[in-house]
Amino acid sequence: GLGSYIIDIHDGGGAGTIVKKVPPYGLPYGVTVSADIDNLMLTGRCVSVDSVVMSSLRVMPTCMVLGEGAGTAAAMAVKKKILPADVNVKQLRKKLVENGVLDCRDVEVFT
């Protein structure tokens, strides 16, 4: 999937906001796979990223893309009787593109 929201960090102490435009970026499958529980996947704002990435990723369009990817991967894992960590990412990407999800390698970046 593809994320594209600005980096938008709000200072907890009220000192201001940091805003930075970023080009569209790919969302790696690994952020949705639990490192501790074999059959657990995470999506939306629960994925494993640092606070800077979360400041861009936290918006609903990006959360929906993560959900589409995690849901498709979960279906593939169940169908093949494998764990989420064992899903073939190339096959997942192909299925997502077939389903209409943009691949960041195919997006022209305007700055």
Positions of the model-derived regions?
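Non-catalytic terminal regions with compositionally biased, polar/charged low complexity
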Residues: 78-111
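Ubiquitous "structural anchor" signal
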Residues: 9-11, 52, 75, 79, ...
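Short, conserved micro-motifs enriched in small and acidic residues
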Residues: 57-65
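Mobile, glycine/GP-rich and aromatic-enriched active-site lid/loop segments adjacent to catalytic centers
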Residues: 1-42, 47-53
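Internal hydrophobic alpha-helix adjacent to the cofactor/substrate pocket in enzyme cavities
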Residues: 64-83
